[in-house]
């Protein structure tokens, strides 16, 4: 790999974010669980490799911090995007950005648990373009045959 190719790959890695919406919160005795609509099928690295991705509250970052795990709605013990994070006390409907996911988005995503893949959006300043459509349930069963 040339230096320029490496630079391009590095930029892609740093440029991508996974934008997710808070569904609800569970309050535990030692920490909270923030359940979001993204899951391990959207970003497998934290569950598979215990990788660290910074998580930023997109809305209302001025709230007090809570210690929380950020987890998906898939019924798996490994369905987490971040563990033991100090994060503003976000509420349902608010958004979180999981950072540095550009090189790991669609290429490592799956349809696990019959979940359609998320769309990909290219943002250039104030402009944006959908570069990969959100999958539908029809996409999931395309190619299947009745027997």
Model regions and ranges:
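Charged (often Lys/Glu-rich) extended helix/loop segments that serve as interaction or gating elements
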Residues: 2-147
């Amino acid at each position: 790999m040339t230096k320029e190719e490496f630079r391009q790959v590095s930029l892609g890695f740093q440029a991508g974010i996974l934008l997710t919406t808070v569904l609800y919160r569970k309050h535990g005795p030692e920490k909270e669980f923030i359940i979001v609509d993204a899951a391990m099928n959207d970003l497998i690295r934290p569950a598979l490799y215990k990788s660290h991705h910074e998580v930023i509250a997109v809305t209302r970052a001025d709230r007090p911090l809570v210690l929380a795990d950020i987890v998906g709605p898939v019924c798996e013990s490994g369905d987490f995007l971040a563990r033991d994070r100090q994060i503003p006390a976000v509420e349902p409907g608010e958004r979180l950005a999981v950072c540095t996911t550009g090189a790991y988005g669609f290429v490592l995503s799956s349809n696990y648990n019959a979940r359609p893949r998320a769309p990909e959006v290219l943002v250039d300043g104030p402009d944006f373009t959908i570069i990969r459509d959100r999958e539908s349930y029809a996409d999931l069963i395309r190619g299947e045959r009745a027997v």
